[in-house]
Amino acid sequence: MTDKIINSGNLEAGYDSVIDKDSKYVMQTYGRQPLVLSKGKGAVVQDIYGKEYIDCVAGIAVNNVGHCHPTVVKAIQAQAEKLIHVSNLYYTEIQAEFAETLASITGMECVFFCNSGAEAVEAAMKLARVATGKSAFVAAEHSFHGRTIGALSVTHKSMYRDPFMPPVSSKTSFVPYSDADAIRKAISEDTAAVVLEPIQGEGGVNVPDPGYLKEVREICDETGTLLIFDEVQTGFGRTGTWFCKEQFGVEPDIMSMAKAIGGGFPMGAIAARSGLSFGRGQHASTFGGGPLACAAALASIQAIKEEKLLERSKEMGAYFTKKLSGMARDDIVEVRGKGLMIGVEIKYPCGKFVDFAREHGVLVNCTSDSVLRLVPPLVITKEQIDSVVDVLEQA
């Protein structure tokens, strides 16, 4: 591993102590792995005992510029010494600067800031409803857009939806992913928007057919329906371009973003085309576009540009995919994805891969039961990729 972490040598708590305290005081909403992490640098994280792991989870596609990128760290430190938080009742230079930057890289007209992906999807849905006066949505099977009540309305997986039915918008039609004709049939006079992930993440790293999103765009134009892209997981270089929409040459009306936007610092946003915007009082976020978040986001974008991480994502993604496809295994169904958003579909539930990899210094996660999702920091090296593939080949 090339990313070296300096170990302080002083253990504040053992695994059992941390896990016991978590079990006692934290609502158990996650099926956590038995791992207590304390540090990170680049594509490597370290546990409290000093053991290092190549991180192919990256906070679930959050740490695109790597853990604790020095440019991001310095920006947060500098901003924290000047201004941490003020109400959005007032202007700040750094928010205005980041809004301009985000509008530029998205190619869209205006933005709204929030704090997470689910909030961004909620804002996109709310904007679609207020802009059209309609209340129904069309979404894809196997979609994931968040677990808050509104976002849950367009999230397909029954284990997330069923305990909370009916959601805020019960008028959601779910259709097969990558089936444009099904979308055409599902759109009604009350459909405000079609909501899609350009590549489905939680659903199994599902890449649509090449012409699918263009056809959906045409259908939306013909029917006067808005098109929302959920780029929460696919954004900021993950697939080899700023946003996955560029891979398919399709522009949405509204786009939701989060995860990698702040270089690891919590932030979310939506961007909208000309003519789509909330009016005063129609939506708000106390912490949205806060000074620390904007400082982190500007620094993250700076790092992506200066270190040519878009190009690196393409290069390392192609290398990783080739290496994974060449593994001497007969239980692999398919290796798919774009850039450094890669899914490895296995013939059976892949939990054992996750456990074996962790025990051998590699972090991966399972999605859709039988798909290994690999979304490492874009700064991962070929040597680290080789190490990951060696471990997975043995699992």
From Swiss-Prot:
Record's subcellular location: Cytoplasm
Cofactor info, note text: Binds 1 pyridoxal phosphate per subunit.
Any one GO BP annotation for this protein: L-arginine biosynthetic process
Reaction(s) catalysed (UniProt annotation): N(2)-acetyl-L-ornithine + 2-oxoglutarate = N-acetyl-L-glutamate 5-semialdehyde + L-glutamate
Residues the record lists as binding pyridoxal 5'-phosphate: G117, A118, F144, D230, E231, V232, Q233, T286
GO molecular function list: identical protein binding; N2-acetyl-L-ornithine:2-oxoglutarate 5-aminotransferase activity; pyridoxal phosphate binding
Keyword field: Amino-acid biosynthesis, Aminotransferase, Arginine biosynthesis, Cytoplasm, Pyridoxal phosphate, Transferase
Modified residues (N6-(pyridoxal phosphate)lysine): K259
Enzyme class: transferase
Cofactor: pyridoxal 5'-phosphate
Pathway assigned to this chain's UniProt record: Amino-acid biosynthesis; L-arginine biosynthesis; N(2)-acetyl-L-ornithine from L-glutamate: step 4/4
Binding site for N(2)-acetyl-L-ornithine: R147, S285
EC number(s) reported in the record: 2.6.1.11
One Pfam family matching this protein: Aminotran_3
InterPro entries: AcOrn/SuccOrn_fam, Aminotrans_3, Aminotrans_3_PPA_site, Class-III_PLP-dep_AT, PyrdxlP-dep_Trfase, PyrdxlP-dep_Trfase_major, PyrdxlP-dep_Trfase_small
GO cellular component: cytoplasm
Lineage top rank: taxon: Archaea
HAMAP family on file: ArgD_aminotrans_3
NCBIfam families: argD, PRK01278.1, PRK03244.1
Family designation: Belongs to the class-III pyridoxal-phosphate-dependent aminotransferase family. ArgD subfamily.
Note: May also have succinyldiaminopimelate aminotransferase activity, thus carrying out the corresponding step in lysine biosynthesis.
Annotated protein name in UniProt: Acetylornithine aminotransferase
Species: Methanosarcina mazei (strain ATCC BAA-159 / DSM 3647 / Goe1 / Go1 / JCM 11833 / OCM 88)
Lineage: Archaea, Methanobacteriati, Methanobacteriota, Stenosarchaea group, Methanomicrobia
Gene: argD
